């Protein structure tokens, strides 16, 4: 019986070859597209290097600010300032770690009278390297002491290091970021752009620049985002509750403004 089914199928395939090939190619293309979508969603949602802690991470990608006593509808949406990030999120005691991360920006990475490349750079702090797990090919991440002191040091991706030096073994050497000298503390394997909260090609301490002074609206608004690492997902409610308490305390210290997060921290960056 099964043999008869195969014979009938082959007969119909030979009888209409054009329809057969269209059907086969259409089915293959549909399966391929579904596989691509599934893999893309997996890469963006499940724990994978360097975002190995997605399942216990919370994010604040933006916030809102309004005049004190005003309605939520009469507000502006923006990134947070370094000051807001420090007082409202870096002060969390229920979290394992909190990092502030700027949006990626284009930067000129160069050697004096040598090679140069344009790369995506983010400004962050030492906690970034605790929350995200990178594979270091040379050197190491900048430390808390480097971050606190504003030391001009940088971590490069492998692609940038190779473009400049021809190798990834460059820890301790110096590069220029927009013509400002930075010491290379380490080199990491390249990161996919799908790792939206960790992606960059150059990472530096935000304390080594003037980004903290780029703030307005009573210094509440700036260019930073926050990533919060919980000890477990069960701590999410406690973290959100403490974040709300810190928000109210912060608002009490402001003269004319109030900040609010529109449902954040949440689990999507």
Where are these regions (language model features)?
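Short, strongly hydrophobic transmembrane alpha-helices
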Residues: 15-45
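Extracytoplasmic
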Residues: 55, 114-116, 124, 148-151, ...
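Short amphipathic beta-strand/extended segments in non-transmembrane regions
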Residues: 61-62, 78-141, 256-262
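Membrane-proximal extracellular/periplasmic loop immediately following the first transmembrane helix
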Residues: 37-108, 221-225
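Coil residues (strongly favoring Ser/Thr
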Residues: 74-75, 147, 253
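A short amphipathic helical element positioned immediately N-terminal to and/or at the very start
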Residues: 2-14, 84-88
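Mid-to-C-terminal secondary-structure elements
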Residues: 125-141, 152-269
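Generic structural signal for small/hydrophobic residues in well-ordered secondary structure
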Residues: 13-16, 23, 44, 58-62, ...
């Amino acid at each position: 019986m099964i043999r008869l089914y195969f014979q009938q199928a082959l007969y119909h395939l030979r009888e209409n070859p054009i329809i057969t090939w269209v059907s086969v190619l259409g089915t293959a293309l549909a399966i391929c597209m579904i596989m691509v979508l599934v893999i893309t969603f997996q890469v963006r949602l499940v724990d994978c290097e360097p975002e190995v802690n997605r399942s216990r991470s919370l994010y604040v990608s933006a916030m809102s600010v309004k005049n004190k006593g005003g309605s939520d509808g009469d507000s502006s949406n923006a990134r947070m300032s370094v000051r807001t990030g420090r007082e409202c999120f870096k002060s969390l005691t229920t979290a394992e770690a909190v990092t502030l991360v700027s949006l990626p920006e284009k930067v000129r990475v160069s050697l004096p009278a040598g090679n140069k490349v344009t790369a995506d750079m983010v400004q962050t702090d030492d906690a970034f390297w605790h929350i995200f797990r990178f594979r270091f090919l040379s050197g190491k991440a900048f430390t808390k002491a480097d971050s606190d002191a504003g030391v001009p040091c940088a971590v490069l991706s492998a692609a940038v290091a190779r473009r400049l030096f021809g190798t990834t073994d460059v820890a301790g050497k110096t590069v220029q970021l927009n013509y400002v000298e930075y010491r290379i503390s380490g080199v990491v394997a390249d990161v996919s752009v799908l790792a939206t909260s960790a992606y960059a090609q150059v990472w530096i301490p935000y304390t080594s620049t003037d980004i903290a002074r780029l703030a307005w609206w009573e210094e509440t608004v700036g260019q930073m985002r926050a990533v919060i690492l919980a000890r477990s997902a069960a701590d999410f409610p406690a973290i959100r509750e403490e974040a709300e308490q810190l928000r109210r305390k912060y608002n009490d210290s402001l003269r004319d403004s109030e900040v609010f997060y529109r449902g954040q921290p949440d689990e999507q960056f």
